[in-house]
């Protein structure tokens, strides 16, 4: 693997068509390893002299924010210097020159900034449900497993097992274990395919580290934020939503909320972070594991705009689908509201739609401008009235299917983004039940006549 990666960097100096294997913008361990291993496989199995280059979809300066990535690269003895990052290759220039073919791994929707590259996408390999509205018109291979690295391991072991070296096997093995929470049946993130390929890798390379050792090491590295500034912690695992120019950042924080709130100069850091990136609000969702290795979740909303902050807090506090079961924590600062989250199965993935609806409800119910943090002439009673209208607008706008999704969730590759089987069983409408009963009643006479014969 290391020799291959060194060759990739050299290939970029040549003016020739290249195939770029591109991971997602989060560049978590699964995305990074899947891109590296899939590009390695394609380069080794393609007869023509084509160049396959894995690209990590972040700036090089952002890699230190991903502690598990840095730790694993060091453990596997892959120097960071041989990796290629998004700010080191101009994909748009290559595309305009007709020299780019894209292969997307661990995602299938390009961001708006890369929309022009969609016509260069030749293949997709992903492990999450397809968004048909934005999926590129190309060969798409999707299977709902716990880790995308499992699908890459499958392709290698089925297509060319002889090319698999210990270094690549160790990368795949550790990544699957981390994504699938050490194959813990109680967590339920690992599918049969995930388990199968972990066992296959262990059989081929018996000297791989024990499951417990590598999982514990990777999880510790992932949750280690001791050396990060507040800004780095907020950027480490962040998503952004927006509506009508209003932007809300949602950051996963890997530590106890109490410790996070006690950081020196925190409020100034939060304000500076929002101003630097033009965020109108920031939602911090903390996750850590207690002494019983159970996940603990907490949540905080920082927003200098009173009406927007109260709308967001009200929607989150009163949400029943999903129920966050929030308990407010007293705060001495009016711009910040923290909560204990009683329902630990509700991850950021489930909170994002609530925040989208909160923004919609806010704009539907009030014309209060966001130009200033506090709007003069707006009383608390007026804000409360607007909040009630926003909440009613949201609740009335939710369809039955939105309140209770019809299928259990797909296992994802991070505890931050998904927990297993927390949406309940499929729900039938009255029309569906009536149709089923009608079909049964129509079939009964036929069945009866046949029995008489």
Curated annotation (Swiss-Prot):
Ranges for region Essential for homodimerization: 393-420
Entry keyword set: Acetylation, Cell junction, Cytoplasm, Hydrolase, Manganese, Metal-binding, Nucleus, Phosphoprotein
GO MF, one annotated term: exopolyphosphatase activity
SMART domains: DHHA2 (SM01131)
Motif, DHH motif: chain positions: 106-108
Cellular component terms (Gene Ontology): cytoplasm; focal adhesion; nucleus
Residues reported in the UniProt entry to bind Mn(2+) 2: 30, 106, 179
Record-linked PANTHER family: BNIP - RELATED, EXOPOLYPHOSPHATASE PRUNE1
Oligomer status and interactors: Homooligomer. Able to homodimerize via its C-terminal domain. Interacts with NME1. Interacts with GSK3; at focal adhesion complexes where paxillin and vinculin are colocalized.
Record-given protein name: Exopolyphosphatase PRUNE1
Organism name: Bos taurus
